[in-house]
């Protein structure tokens, strides 16, 4: 056993992740490991940490599950994605992982990189740089109707500028999020 610690990111809705439950049990018994679950707080082990908000997955820049991250001296020293027995054994220092399992299997796409999710997570947990004031819209009020009532349309349909839409638009321009373009 090494002085390394590990973080494992999984989701129940991934055949590779569900196949590897015996491996997670082996690792938990022999290594300091934190298991983050993206979709089911009861999976894969009782010690798993609920990451349904995907905040930790976002900050860890997870693209595929399972992802096993190794830390040494408090900093990430490596990561592996998917399942390849020999690679996991070398990476963790634990031999004979998952003896009855197939030797290799690719992982699945992580929930935090699903279409539309990257923008939502960037606005929620990242540094979007946006400082514009938000206009509160009563939940009983239709934001499109409100835009028409305030004269924010030339008669064409209006798409309310949600933070996600604004962030996505800013990715296609050289404008800074705090730049004033009109008054």
Question: Model-predicted segments: where are they?
Answer:
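Short active-site neighborhood of thiol/selenol oxidoreductases, capturing the structured segment around
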Residues: 2-24
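Residue-level signal for short, function-critical loop segments
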Residues: 11-13, 39, 74
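Thiol-based oxidoreductase modules, predominantly thioredoxin-like and allied folds used
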Residues: 30-54
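Long, low-complexity intrinsically disordered regions
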Residues: 100-126
């Amino acid at each position: 056993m090494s002085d390394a610690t590990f973080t494992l990111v999984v989701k129940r809705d991934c055949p590779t992740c569900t196949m590897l439950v015996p491996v997670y049990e082996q690792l938990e018994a022999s290594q300091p490991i934190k298991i983050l679950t993206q979709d089911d707080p009861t999976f894969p082990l009782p010690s798993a940490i609920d990451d349904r908000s995907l905040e930790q997955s976002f900050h860890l820049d997870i693209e595929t599950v399972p992802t096993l991250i190794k830390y040494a001296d408090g900093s990430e020293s490596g990561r592996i994605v998917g399942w390849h027995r020999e690679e996991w054994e070398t990476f963790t220092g634990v031999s004979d992982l998952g003896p009855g399992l197939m030797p290799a299997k690719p992982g699945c796409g992580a929930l935090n990189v699903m279409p539309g999710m990257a923008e939502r997570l960037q606005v929620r947990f990242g540094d979007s740089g946006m400082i514009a004031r938000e206009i509160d819209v009563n939940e009983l009020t239709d934001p499109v109707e409100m835009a028409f009532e305030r004269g924010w349309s030339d008669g064409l349909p209006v798409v309310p500028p949600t933070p996600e839409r604004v962030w996505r638009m800013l990715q296609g321009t050289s404008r800074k999020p705090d730049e004033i373009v009109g008054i």
